[in-house]
Regions:
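Nucleotide/phosphate-binding catalytic cleft detector across ATP-hydrolyzing
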Residues: 1-55, 60-146
């Protein structure tokens, strides 16, 4: 069965013949003792990424926590439809979001994903964005098509 992946700035959405899943494209860095934070998040089955000693809650859970703690800043791994160059932890966060939505491929499954067109009025490069997403999706065992 093939899967489709729409990599939007606000949401990532996957679709198959019979289902649609979406995940917010945001993350939240949690301050405090990383080991203690990870234990708490694991107990509550909240998806997170650890990078350089920092713990990041990803997706809808990050959004929910930000609503509770209003002084907390949500971050986006993408900006204007492309990878956010200002977020150094964007890649592991995107990997977690994509992995949660797609899961491991079953056999020779195909995943078709979309990227934005190269704008005519800006000097943004989409090929790096395309290559990074392809590489992430391939790590889950999919045959990838753009």
């Amino acid at each position: 069965m093939a899967k489709g992946l729409d990599c939007g700035t606000s949401y990532y959405i996957t679709a198959t013949e019979d289902s649609i899943k979406k995940q917010r494209n945001v993350f939240l860095t949690v301050d405090g003792d990383a080991n203690q934070v990870k234990r708490m998040l694991k107990r509550q089955r909240i998806p997170f990424v650890e990078k350089a000693g920092k713990v990041h809650i990803v997706g809808q859970h990050a959004f929910n926590y930000a609503q509770i703690f209003s002084t907390t800043e949500l971050k986006r791994p993408m900006s204007q439809g492309l990878l956010n160059p200002k977020e150094k932890d964007a890649l592991p966060v995107l990997n977690a979001i994509i992995g949660e939505l797609l899961g491991k491929a079953k056999g020779k499954e195909t995943c078709v994903y979309c990227i934005p067109a190269k704008p005519i009025d800006q000097t943004r490069e989409v090929s790096y964005h395309e290559d990074v997403l392809k590489q992430i999706i391939e790590t889950y065992g999919y045959d990838v098509k753009v």
